[in-house]
Regions:
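N-terminal presequence-like segments and the immediate start of the first folded domain
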Residues: 1-68, 72-85, 91-141
Length: 141
C-alpha cells in the first residue's frame, strides 16, 4: 500500500494505492481521502492478479468482478461495503444490460442498507468493458 499525505493536516488529501488492487488503466489513485471521506476510483472488471487476462463475458460477470475489485480497495482502507454512502454505475449497453447489472449489484448490499446511486449510460469504457463503478465511503467517527 502506498499512502501519500503531502501536507500532513487532517484536511489535506491522502492518496491511497494498493498492490492488491487491479493495475491502474490510467493515471489515478485507487482512493483519495480527506476528513474521513473517501472517493474510490471507478473499478474495471479486470483481474487483479492478471491485468492481461481477457475481461469476463457478460455484464453479470463483469459487475461481480467490478464489485469484488471495489471490495479489495475498501479492505485496503480497513473498510467494507457497509461504509459506502453512494455509488455511480457507468454502463455501455443500458437498455440491454441494466436489469442484469442491477440484479448482480443489489446482491452485494442488504435491502435496508443500499447506498445512494446514480446509473449513467455511456458510449464506451476503457478496455471495452461493459460496466464501471465508483464509490464514496466514509470512515466511522
Amino acid at each position: 500500500m502506498t499512502v501519500i499525505n503531502p501536507g500532513g493536516n487532517m484536511s489535506d488529501p491522502i492518496f491511497h494505492n494498493f498492490s492488491s488492487a487491479p493495475t491502474h488503466v490510467a493515471p489515478f489513485s485507487h482512493a483519495v481521502e480527506s476528513d474521513g471521506w473517501i472517493q474510490i476510483t471507478g473499478q474495471m472488471p479486470t483481474d487483479p492478479d492478471d491485468d492481461s487476462a481477457p475481461l469476463a463475458e457478460g455484464v453479470e460477470a463483469q459487475t461481480r468482478r467490478v464489485m469484488d475489485n471495489l471490495i479489495i480497495v475498501l479492505e485496503g482502507l480497513g473498510l467494507g461495503l457497509e461504509h459506502v454512502l453512494s455509488t455511480r454505475v457507468y454502463i455501455t449497453e443500458f437498455k440491454r444490460d441494466y436489469e442484469d447489472m442491477n440484479n448482480t449489484y443489489k446482491s452485494y448490499f442488504p435491502e435496508d442498507r443500499r447506498p445512494a446511486r446514480t446509473c449513467i449510460g455511456v458510449t464506451g469504457l476503457a478496455r471495452d468493458a461493459l460496466v464501471e463503478i465508483d464509490m464514496v465511503a466514509k470512515r466511522p467517527d
